[in-house]
């Protein structure tokens, strides 16, 4: 009840489902009186956006570089995290320095930062409300949804589409 969990999905493009850990709420909700993890859980998928603008984009403008959202589709976001400058080990020389990296582990901190910005803008929001706000405002105009989630934590019913591959889509903090 005190935070949002942002989990990096795996980077195995040939897998057909989200990693087990990225989809934990799918496997444990309601099991043996477990907590509903999906209330404040976001899985981050690794993709590359090759278009020039999300306005008018289509699925052909995205290249999935990791696992699909799959079982985590109802709380999954897509982030282009192919060229992120990060500190880390570059080679076997044990020298740490900034390098350009990619992967869902580079996208999860981006989404965590978005949650932090939303919590600053909406300090009275619960973790579930912050999660719902981010998922419900994601840009999904570039794919065909296969299902809908109805978000009700803000007092109104807001439907937002998702699909098995792309989850809810790309986060849109300006929405």
Predicted regions, residues:
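Extracellular S/T/G-rich loop segment that most often corresponds to the catalytic His/Ser-adjacent loop
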Residues: 25-116, 120
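Acidic glycine-/aspartate-rich tracts in secreted/extracellular proteins
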Residues: 10-13, 48-50, 139-142
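Active-site neighborhood of phospho(di)ester-bond hydrolases with catalytic His/Asp-centered motifs
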Residues: 6-10, 44
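Metal-dependent catalytic neighborhoods of phosphoester/phosphodiester hydrolases
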Residues: 18-23
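Residue-level detector of functionally special positions within alpha-helical transmembrane segments
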Residues: 10, 103-105, 167, 172
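C-terminal subdomain of the subtilisin-like protease fold in secreted/lumenal serine endopeptidases
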Residues: 40-43, 120-175
């Amino acid at each position: 009840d005190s935070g949002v969990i942002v989990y990096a999905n795996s980077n195995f493009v040939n897998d057909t489902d989200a990693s087990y850990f990225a989809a934990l709420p799918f496997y444990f909700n309601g099991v043996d009186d477990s907590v509903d993890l999906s209330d404040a859980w976001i899985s981050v998928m690794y993709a590359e956006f090759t278009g020039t603008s999300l306005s008018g984009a289509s699925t052909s403008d995205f290249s999935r570089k990791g696992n699909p959202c799959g079982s985590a589709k109802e709380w999954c976001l897509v982030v282009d995290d192919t060229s992120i400058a990060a500190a880390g080990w570059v080679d076997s020389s044990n020298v740490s320095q900034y390098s350009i990296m990619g992967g869902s582990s580079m996208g999860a901190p981006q989404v965590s930062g978005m949650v932090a910005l939303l919590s600053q803008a909406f300090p009275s929001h619960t973790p579930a409300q912050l999660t719902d706000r981010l998922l419900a405002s994601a840009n999904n105009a570039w794919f065909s949804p296969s299902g809908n989630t109805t978000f009700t934590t803000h007092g109104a019913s807001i439907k937002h589409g998702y699909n098995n591959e792309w989850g809810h889509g790309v986060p849109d903090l300006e929405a």
